[in-house]
Amino acid sequence: MPANTKPYSRLDMAKWVLQAEAIAQSKPLPPYLQTRLDAMREGLAEEIAYLQGAGKINNVKLRGASVDLSYLQQDSAAYKYNNAKAHWQLLNHNNNGYLYGDGFNAVGTLHISGSLSKDLAVGITPRFSWDKDEHGDASLIEGYAKTHLGVWGITAGRQPMSWGVGRAGQLAFGSNATPQTAIKLNLLEPHTFDNGALKFLGKANVNVFASRLEGNRVASSGSALEKDHAALVGVRVDIMPTDAFTIGLERMSMLKKFNKHWLLGDNADDAEKDNWNDIAGLDFKYRFPGVQVYASLYGEDQAHAFPCENAYNVGMYFPQLVPDGSWDLRVEAAKTNDAWYGHWVLKNGWTYKDAILGDWLGADAKRVYAEVNHYLADGGKLGLSYTWADMQQTAQHDGRLQEVELSYSKSLQKDLLLHTAVGYGKLRDDTSKLVAVGLSWEY
């Protein structure tokens, strides 16, 4: 089972394709799944050949391109949180910090990646957009170089990351905010505890990263106690006692400076001496026959070196509503308390470039999420999702939100994918309506 850390590398995905093909030798796949597996094999042909010892990975090239057109009719462009300097938008979550403009939106992306040698991989994904509010804009979703030193992978640059479990959102660190430029270390392969006292742990993977936040945090917060270019560091260990069970331990810290008190977890009671904001906790995923169960329990603060002011999410994924697996279902619930994502010294809160680094749900909130998907034999997919949330529950206004979205995707030809969506969202008396259509090419 993959660790609960994204993104996955192309080599990782190639290994999983080979594993799936080995399983399919004794247990034939249903048509819809075979179509998807064949498409992945074709897209990862060079990596698969390399793993089989029949080729080299010197393949930096254009991997894909996409054009997305959407029309958004909204009563409000964005909504603010009570205790964090950030905003969010109806029908637009976990989108790497990007907001839609009111009315017509056009977005184009190019994805270029590959390996310069067996020791160096690179990737770049520029994004070009236009809407009537911001007019034309160009940005970089990702741009990175990756190498290795012994058993460690080393990545430098910008790359969207998400840690933890949950489809609707991750509590500490997800894809809701703009990707950061960071240095990341990870084990290239999980460490196996073959013998000894720790054999019961099975396998373990480690991810570590460090980045800097934006340089205008003092001015935007209006507080001299804030820190421009504060550090953001994260450590995550995924332990896999069995192939069906993964447990993750995670600590994320927003730091004014490094010192022994942070290492030991000794919080200061004086605002002048409080130099960090932590989110830490654990999550797990267990795969039973016919259902996967996952949950998180994280603390936004600490008491005696242990997390407190807790939040949680819990979910169940049913991969086979019918015997061939062409229908699946996911249901989730999440809850945060009123301390989440805010801080008494770092006034901007748990944010980066006006978006929460964790779950868009925010503080003092709860959410129920459900989605059902039907996978078609030609590789297409039909999906329906529903979100109900009560945001900022103790605020004076009514924060109840409902969103429903219907999506459909279909392969028009070998390397061309059509994807469409319609959505409706409501918050108090405000509504938002979305119609989107896009084309993606894979090369």
Q: Where do the language-model regions lie?
A:
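N-terminal periplasmic/intermembrane-space "pro-region" immediately following the signal or transit peptide
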Residues: 1-98
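Extracellular/periplasm-exposed beta-strand and loop segments of Gram-negative cell-envelope proteins
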Residues: 99, 111, 189, 356-361
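Outer-membrane beta-barrel translocator/receptor signature
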Residues: 92, 102-108
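Short loop/turn motifs that connect adjacent beta-strands in outer-membrane beta-barrel proteins
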Residues: 2-4, 25-35, 52-63, 114-122, ...
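Structural signature for solvent-exposed beta-strand/loop edge elements and short helix-capping sites
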Residues: 1, 9-29, 40, 160-182, ...
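Signature for the C-terminal beta-barrel architecture of outer-membrane proteins
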Residues: 119, 162, 182-353, 363-375, ...
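Surface-exposed loop and membrane-interface regions of Gram-negative outer-membrane beta-barrel proteins
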Residues: 99-104, 116-149, 163-176, 305-306
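Outer-membrane beta-barrel "beta-signal"
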Residues: 410, 419-421, 431-443
